[in-house]
């Protein structure tokens, strides 16, 4: 008798899990609340453009993973060398290369450059990092206070919504490379994007699943899980109640906080969401030459990152037109999440003019998308709850949360 899996969610994790289980002889059903698969990596067409939930790059230094990607998706991946910059300054006219390099540091004003070099020598102390009690202390011990204040203070707060001294040290980057030269963001790694948006890769996986006998149930939201003696007995959706037999395994790819709540375990685990505003422009290109995305840590503009998707793949926008994605992080229930979509779009357009990227007369259309569960937030005082909730879920014999 074939073993059977019921997978909740059809994002990358759910799709790849289904694909590989089917290849091993399992029967697989997938339940998805949206009308299409792909989760946070889905793509869709709108007004002649291909939109992503957010720009995604397939990158890895692992040769086996590169081989796997090229074997299965080579014809729908566009390899590239991708560059980005931090845009700062009162007039948004200061451009800083990222990741850091000695070449870029040498372009700094002499006094600032010397100060940073001294701090890099003084603070290069593993013992200080081990003693760090929060993100701020850890980054200080890694690169010194000057670079931290320039690049790792305002931006993390804008992304996560909390001060860096309230964030745990493990949020901090484990290491910050100082390269000799200004090089692509993903140096010495395979890097590519989906030719027709990230979703085209996951659409292919979906087709592989169908060809192997997997079944999809779209537009169906899981609203509860019933259990008895540490086994899941039923999956309840907005359409149906599914009985789980002894030979069936439930695999949840939903956020761990949601999986716990479906089992009746309330919790305070939080996520940061991403609102993406799409700007369709009657221009060939917008960002500076060879720049694919830019970061903004300023409180005076709504967005934290702007990506020109057509620079990643020319196939996502019509000829002589381009597409910008403005990303804004938020939390469910905060002031931003209560704004009307039109007001958000209008503010993004004003801010794009402010940073001198887009004039309104170039804009031929806009759209907006919300993803409320993107980045798991871990306040220092909630770290124990994360372990507690994961342990609670692991107690169920026929349930896996991945």
How should each PLM-predicted stretch be described?
Residues 104, 112, 116-227:
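Active-site/ligand-binding neighborhood in enzyme catalytic cores
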Residues 314-319, 371-401:
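FAD-binding beta-loop-beta segment adjacent to the flavin cofactor pocket
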Residues 24, 223-342, 347-361, 390-391:
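Mid-domain catalytic core of redox enzymes
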Residues 64-92, 146-150, 268-272, 286-288, ...:
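A short alpha-helix-loop-beta-strand transition element characteristic
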Residues 13, 36, 257:
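Conserved Rossmann-like nucleotide-cofactor binding loop
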Residues 22-45:
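Glycine-rich FAD pyrophosphate-binding loop
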Residues 47-127:
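Dinucleotide-binding Rossmann-like beta1-alpha1 core, especially the glycine-rich loop
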Residues 3-30:
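N-terminal Rossmann-like FAD-binding beta1-loop-alpha1 element of flavoenzymes
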């Amino acid at each position: 008798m074939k073993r059977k899996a019921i997978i909740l969610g059809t994002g990358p994790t759910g799709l790849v899990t289904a694909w590989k289980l089917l290849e091993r002889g399992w029967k697989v059903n997938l339940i998805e609340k949206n009308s299409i698969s792909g989760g946070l990596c889905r793509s869709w067409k709108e007004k002649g453009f291909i939109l992503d939930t957010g720009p995604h790059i397939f990158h890895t230094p692992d040769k086996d993973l590169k081989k796997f990607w090229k074997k299965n998706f080579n014809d729908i991946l566009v390899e590239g060398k991708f560059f980005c910059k931090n845009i700062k300054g009162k007039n948004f006219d200061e451009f800083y290369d990222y990741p850091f390099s000695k070449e870029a540091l040498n372009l700094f004003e002499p006094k600032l450059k010397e100060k940073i070099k001294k701090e890099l020598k003084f603070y290069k102390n593993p013992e200080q990092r081990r003693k760090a009690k929060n993100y701020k202390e850890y980054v200080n011990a890694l690169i010194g206070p000057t670079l931290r204040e320039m690049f790792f203070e305002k931006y993390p707060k804008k992304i996560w919504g909390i001060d860096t001294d309230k964030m745990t040290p493990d949020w901090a980057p484990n290491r910050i490379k100082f390269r000799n030269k200004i090089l692509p963001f993903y140096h010495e790694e395979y890097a590519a994007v989906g030719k027709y948006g990230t979703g085209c890769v996951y659409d292919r996986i979906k087709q592989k699943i169908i060809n192997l006998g997997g079944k999809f149930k779209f537009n169906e939201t899981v609203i509860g899980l019933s259990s008895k003696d540490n086994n899941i007995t039923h999956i309840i959706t907005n359409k149906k109640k599914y009985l789980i037999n002894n030979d069936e395994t439930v695999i949840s790819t939903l956020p761990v906080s949601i999986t716990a709540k479906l089992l009746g375990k309330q919790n305070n685990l939080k996520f940061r969401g991403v609102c993406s505003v799409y700007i369709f422009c009657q221009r060939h290109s917008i960002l500076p030459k060879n720049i694919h995305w830019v970061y903004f840590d300023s409180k005076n503009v709504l967005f934290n990152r702007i990506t020109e998707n057509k620079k990643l793949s020319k196939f996502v926008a019509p000829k002589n037109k381009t597409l910008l994605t403005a990303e804004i992080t938020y939390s469910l229930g905060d002031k931003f999440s209560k704004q009307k979509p039109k007001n958000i779009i209008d503010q993004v357009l004003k801010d794009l003019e402010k940073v001198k990227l887009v004039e309104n007369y170039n804009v031929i259309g806009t759209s907006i998308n919300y993803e409320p569960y993107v980045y798991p937030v871990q306040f220092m005082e909630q770290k124990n709850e994360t372990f507690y909730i994961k342990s609670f879920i692991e107690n169920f014999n026929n349930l896996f949360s991945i």
